[in-house]
């Protein structure tokens, strides 16, 4: 084992005061030669995603001690997207990714920790931890809190998205208030992150593919015993990684990120994966850009039938073989790089050796490569005069991903949702929600409430919604987000007027407004930059330093 980084605070006469502090929290003489391992715990009672993390932290802490390390627990924050959704509070969600990254980096580096074991559940916990891990490049592993089991109502599987869609169904007369309350009471049965292939489960899969969490761990249910056993094993593996000097940047290669993108396409993952993978890769110094997603999408099919647009939830994927089964299918098809390694030092080819070549015949969650749900990936990168830097369209479940229609323009998510619930949106409309980007929001809110209301009203196949904001992993339909440049910095989305014809064409990877360059230039000359919405606090700071979404909306370029 190499010289421990923590020797800076534990060794030598001059560090006697430092050691006295450590003795006060339980260190003995022999402990000063052990690796100090940070346990970054995102436990919170504010969300079911994180309410079960403490038991995992305790299991990991015990395992670290048994394996010869010294665990040092500290907390980091979380934001509950499900609670914040549709409110001003959602502006803090993406910001929390940076707060989580900064807090983990700060705690670990300030105390010269030798390694970190990060534990998280809700959406931004995963990319926040990965950004910190890439910055520090000390031996690291991530423990996902686990997915929630599906809610049940009259034999139907429910997720949190069922509740959002029920709002639209109620306002369009498809259900009554009694049914709405039944869905509300039954869609979230306990601890765990939202149950479909939404953002949390998508990003936990990304971490597993990158090799920084254990195989199969990203799809385990939060309340199952195997999740606790996995936490213990993760801690043991981390101590081994310290001895082997396996570091995150050894694993976070360009090929590893390409593997992650391939798997996200195959499972039908969240649009947020684009934003977060770009941010993590940027921190790791890896040249991954938005065009890489389109390149990989063209060759990787969607082979998993998962919610929000599909039939099954993440526990079903786990029971069908999980992410390793998906990876084995892609590996055999030459669609991922088998030489990439994981935290145990094993190559993908090695640790998938005992995974069957084909998915089990008694399930319908994972398909073979020769009979996919969709022949190409579902996350299309669209460009055009409305998104010169690019945008992200989620086209799974959309029969005809092409629409030209008049713009219905809204300057905020709230105004858009109000119009939808008042039945002001009709088939053929292109709904535009702008000034919701990283700078303009600020914070790039997710448009789950509007998209769910559109789907709930039966317009999911007939209306497009485009925005410089984001979408929840639970959104589906013809939706285009991450439009860059955003409205607040003078992107062309700021120049659209009510009724302008907009074309969204995911087949041709095109998003444009039917206006000449001359007309756009004329409007740009008359455009007035909006005043900042916040003058103090974290949203004010964030809006001044955040990058464009096409670079991952990072704050440390």
From Swiss-Prot:
Family in the record: Belongs to the IlvD/Edd family.
Active site as annotated: 472 (proton acceptor)
Cofactor binding annotation: Binds 1 [2Fe-2S] cluster per subunit. This cluster acts as a Lewis acid cofactor.
Protein's name in the database: Dihydroxy-acid dehydratase
SUPFAM superfamilies xrefs: IlvD/EDD N-terminal domain-like, LeuD/IlvD-like
EC id: 4.2.1.9
Cofactor dependency: [2Fe-2S] cluster; Mg(2+)
Function description: Functions in the biosynthesis of branched-chain amino acids. Catalyzes the dehydration of (2R,3R)-2,3-dihydroxy-3-methylpentanoate (2,3-dihydroxy-3-methylvalerate) into 2-oxo-3-methylpentanoate (2-oxo-3-methylvalerate) and of (2R)-2,3-dihydroxy-3-methylbutanoate (2,3-dihydroxyisovalerate) into 2-oxo-3-methylbutanoate (2-oxoisovalerate), the penultimate precursor to L-isoleucine and L-valine, respectively.
Binding site for Mg(2+): 81, 123-124, 446
Modified residues (N6-carboxylysine): 124
Pathway assigned in UniProt: Amino-acid biosynthesis; L-isoleucine biosynthesis; L-isoleucine from 2-oxobutanoate: step 3/4; Amino-acid biosynthesis; L-valine biosynthesis; L-valine from pyruvate: step 3/4
Positions contributing to [2Fe-2S] cluster binding: 49, 122, 194
Superkingdom of this protein's organism: Bacteria
Subunit structure: Homodimer.
Pfam name, any one: ILVD_EDD_N
Catalytic activity entry: (2R)-2,3-dihydroxy-3-methylbutanoate = 3-methyl-2-oxobutanoate + H2O; (2R,3R)-2,3-dihydroxy-3-methylpentanoate = (S)-3-methyl-2-oxopentanoate + H2O
GO MF annotation terms: 2 iron, 2 sulfur cluster binding; dihydroxy-acid dehydratase activity; magnesium ion binding
GO terms classed as biological process: isoleucine biosynthetic process; L-valine biosynthetic process
UniProt organism field: Prochlorococcus marinus (strain MIT 9215)
Keywords: 2Fe-2S, Amino-acid biosynthesis, Branched-chain amino acid biosynthesis, Iron, Iron-sulfur, Lyase, Magnesium, Metal-binding
């Amino acid at each position: 084992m190499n010289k421990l980084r923590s020797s800076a605070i534990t060794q030598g006469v001059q560090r006697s005061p430092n050691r006295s502090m450590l003795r006060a929290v339980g260190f003995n003489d022999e402990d000063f030669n052990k690796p100090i391992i940070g346990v970054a715990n995102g436990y919170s009672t504010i969300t079911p995603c994180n309410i079960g993390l403490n038991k995992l932290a305790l299991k990991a802490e015990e395992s670290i001690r048994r394996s010869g390390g010294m665990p040092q627990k500290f907390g980091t924050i979380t934001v509950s997207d499900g609670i914040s959704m549709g409110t001003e509070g959602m502006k803090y969600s993406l910001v929390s990714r940076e707060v989580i990254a900064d807090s983990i980096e700060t705690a670990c580096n300030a105390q010269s920790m030798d390694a970190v074991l990060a534990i998280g559940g809700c959406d931004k916990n995963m990319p926040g931890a990965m950004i910190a891990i890439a910055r520090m490049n000390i031996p690291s592993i991530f423990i996902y809190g686990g997915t929630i089991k599906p809610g049940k109502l009259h034999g139907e599987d429910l997720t949190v998205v069922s509740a959002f869609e029920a709002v639209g169904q109620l306002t369009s007369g498809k259900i009554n208030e009694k049914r709405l309350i039944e869905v509300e009471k039954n869609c979230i049965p306990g601890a765990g992150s939202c149950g479909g292939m939404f953002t949390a489960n998508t990003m936990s899969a990304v971490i597993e593919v990158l090799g920084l969490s254990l195989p199969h761990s990203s799809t385990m249910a939060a309340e199952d015993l195997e999740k606790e056993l996995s936490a213990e094993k993760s801690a043991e593996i981390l101590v081994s990684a310290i001895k082997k000097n396996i570091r995150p940047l050894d694993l976070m290669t360009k090929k590893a990120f390409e593997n992650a993108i391939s798997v996200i396409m195959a499972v039908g993952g969240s649009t947020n994966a684009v934003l977060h993978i770009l941010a993590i890769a940027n921190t790791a110094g890896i040249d991954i850009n938005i065009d890489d997603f389109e390149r990989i999408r063209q060759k990787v099919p969607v082979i998993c039938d998962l919610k929000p647009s599909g039939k099954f939830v993440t526990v079903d994927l786990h029971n069908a073989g999980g992410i390793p089964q998906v990876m084995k299918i892609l590996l055999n098809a030459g669609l991922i790089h088998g030489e990439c390694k994981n935290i145990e030092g094993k190559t993908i080819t090695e640790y998938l050796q005992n995974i069957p070549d084909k998915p089990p015949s008694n399930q319908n969650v994972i398909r073979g490569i020769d009979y996919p749900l969709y022949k190409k990936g579902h996350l299309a990168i669209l460009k055009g005069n409305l998104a010169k830097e690019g945008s992200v369209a989620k086209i799974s479940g959309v029969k005809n991903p092409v629409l030209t229609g008049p713009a219905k323009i809204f300057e905020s998510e709230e105004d858009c949702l109000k119009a939808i619930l008042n039945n002001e949106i009709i088939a053929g409309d292109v709904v535009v929600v702008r000034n919701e980007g990283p700078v303009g929001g600020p914070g790039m809110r997710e448009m789950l409430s509007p998209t769910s209301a559109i789907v709930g009203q039966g317009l999911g196949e007939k209306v497009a919604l485009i925005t410089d904001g984001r979408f929840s992993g639970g959104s589906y339909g013809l939706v285009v987000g991450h439009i860059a440049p955003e409205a607040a910095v003078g992107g062309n989305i700021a120049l659209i007027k009510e009724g302008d014809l907009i074309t969204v064409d995911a087949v041709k990877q095109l998003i444009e407004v039917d206006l000449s360059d001359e007309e756009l230039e004329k409007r740009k000359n008359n455009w007035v930059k909006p005043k900042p919405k916040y003058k103090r606090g974290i949203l004010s700071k964030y809006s001044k330093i955040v990058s464009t979404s096409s670079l991952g909306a990072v704050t440390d370029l």
